[in-house]
Structure formats: C-alpha cells, structure tokens
Amino acid sequence: MIDFDGYRPNVGIVICNRKGQVLWAKRYGQNSWQYPQGGINDGETPEQAMYRELYEEVGLTRRDVRIVYASKQWLRYKLPKRLLRYDSKPMCIGQKQRWFLVQLMSDEKNINMNCSKSPEFDGWRWVSFWYPVRQVVSFKRDVYRKAMKEFACFLFDANKTVNPLSTNNNDEKKANYSAKKPYSPYRNQDKKRKTRV
C-alpha cells in the first residue's frame, strides 16, 4: 500500500526496559542495526500493525508490553536512489511512519527473533536512549531524531524519571548482547568499550 505521494505507511517501535534503555536490533545477516518496523496492511490501524510487527520481529505480544506513547504525526524519510525500484507501480520513494514507544513489562527472555518464516533480525541489545540516533543508517537518522525527541519526556523506569538527555554513556558501555550465540561487537570502538567494563 503506497500513498498518493509515493510513501509506504509504516510503524516504528521503540521498546524500552525499566532502566530506560531501548532495544536495538541487528538486521539478519548484516552489520546494520535499527528499531523494529514494518508496513501497515490494508484495513489495519497503526496500533494493530504495531502489535503484529512486534510479534513477527521480536516475538512479543500485547501482554508483554504497554504502550507509553504514540507519535502524533506521520514522520517521513526518502529512500536513497540506489534502493528505489523504478519498475514497480506505483513507485515507493520512502516510508511514512507512526512511531510507538512501548515498555517491556514481561521478562526479556520472551524476546524471540525467530517468530516469522523470514526473520528480520538475528541479534539485539539494550542501549542508551540516544545511541540509535547516532548509529542508524544515515537516511533514517532525521526520523529517528524526531521520534526520540517526541518520546524523550515519556521515558521512565519503574520508580523514577529517567533523563534521556543525559550525557552519561554507561548504558552503551554495559550493553547486553543477546542472540542464540553470544554476540561480539561489530565495531572497534564497541570492542574497546567491552574490554573497559
């Protein structure tokens, strides 16, 4: 489903834990990381699409999370020319996304990247709130920044307010890597951080 302007309706999902960290997922077979996201099907509301994608991509159900906040407007990004499919009709030039901030209410052991026939991700870790804005592929960076700015005042842990604007980088240093096998950091700077902990 592509709109009149060439954008595909989509949802993006930021999953936070009680420490104020967010789930950062590694794309299957790649050294590329992003938040869970996916298209909205015909007849589906953004919230229904979010719950479907949440299960398909990370194995969580509506019982495992609670919605903290949903973005008020569509956020758009254009695809780079190298990713455009010029032969498709109508042609998709990018994504327009509704973003959801959800809090993980169940055990993180319920996270499962293999709930669909074609998994999107093969690893994940908890990172600090602003870390993904600096690390995501460049053409998604502006949308991530806008979504995270909108979510910043809603992020909290169980007992106290978390300040996502903090410059404390301890969350990245202590990032938990998870997958079937222990995940080794993909960048030299992450390797250095891991050895300092």
From Swiss-Prot:
Region annotation (Disordered) maps to: 165-197
Where is each Nudix hydrolase domain found?
Answer: 6-149
- Which Gene3D superfamilies does the record match to this protein? Nucleoside Triphosphate Pyrophosphohydrolase
Cofactors (names)? a divalent metal cation
Q: Does the keyword Hydrolase apply?
A: yes
Q: Name one GO cellular component term.
A: cytoplasm
Q: Does the keyword Chaperone apply?
A: no
Keyword line: Hydrolase
Identify the InterPro entries for this entry.
Answer: Nudix_hydrolase, NUDIX_hydrolase-like_dom_sf, NUDIX_hydrolase_CS, NUDIX_hydrolase_dom, RppH
Q: Where is this motif: Nudix box?
A: 38-59
Q: Name one GO biological process term.
A: mRNA catabolic process
Looking up PANTHER family in the UniProt record yields: M7GPPPN-MRNA HYDROLASE
Q: What does this protein do?
A: Accelerates the degradation of transcripts by removing pyrophosphate from the 5'-end of triphosphorylated RNA, leading to a more labile monophosphorylated state that can stimulate subsequent ribonuclease cleavage.
Family to which this protein belongs: Belongs to the Nudix hydrolase family. RppH subfamily.
According to UniProt, the name of this protein is RNA pyrophosphohydrolase
